[in-house]
Amino acid sequence: MKKLIYLWLLASVLLAVACTDDDDVFSEESGVRLQAVIDECNTTLRGAENGWKMVYYPKVESYGGYTFLFKFGTKNRVQMISDFDMSEDTDYSYNFNTSESVVLTFDSYSPLHRLADPQYPAPDYSNKKGYGVEGDFEFVVKKVTADTLYLVGKKNRVEVLLTKATGEDWLLVSMMAEMSSCFALSENERLGMSVHGVLMASGLVELDDIYNICKISYKDEEGDAVSVESPYIMTDKGCQFIQEIEVAGIKFSGLNVDLSEGFNNREFVSNDEGGSIRFFIQNFAPLNLTRDQIPTYVPNKNIASVDLLRTTNGNDVR
């Protein structure tokens, strides 16, 4: 009986050792494979003369898109620019880890992190904070080819591509970043609207330059309220909507920025053939006018606060 017990114990020990050896072998093989993928990624990323381009829609059809350019270098450094950030400091760090297969992570705060920043009120969640644009700064590498890396956001699971960039891309994205500053309105600024040169008093445009959303409200010929909304992505001339929209019977797919009168008097022009609709800055900040000055103030389409004062004080002379 004792011999049987000893034999059983010996078999158990040998089995445990065998299993441990197998686990080590498989673990080692897996680690080697993952390191090979990481090496391939680094070689591919660092070998692109003009770097890489990412056109990223974190939540397509809800929010707009964003364009990034990357130039990967040694010592895990990466040069990064975007279509919304004009910072002179473009040097950041990146790394690979194996938390989920192979993961490309940008591990210093960069423009990519803004898309995951929870401080911004989210339109899809009744403007509550805590969600951000629902972007990622960690991406699971699914496939690597000579000119494309196929990625999936680690948290939000949105597929995105890294494709080889051109020298022209760097110029265009810099121009997009300059254009994006035109879409940032101050607290007291709104956009008024004219169609074929005729002012539409009911027209109002809201630009959300964090989530890249354009919302246009107006009244049609029957006096019914109409609201049209579209996410957009920046271009070197203005913005492009994700789909064509129709406003006051005019179809267009984006806005071009007119800076001919200077930045403060910039206008946004529909990109239909005739540039039929123009959106202009209106300032709602209070003016230091006396009651007697209000009725005689010369109208200015860019200063809406005067019209508000006239109506409020019973001096509406329109």
Whereabouts are the PLM-identified features?
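C-terminal motif of bacterial Sec signal peptides marking the signal peptidase cleavage site
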Residues: L15-A18
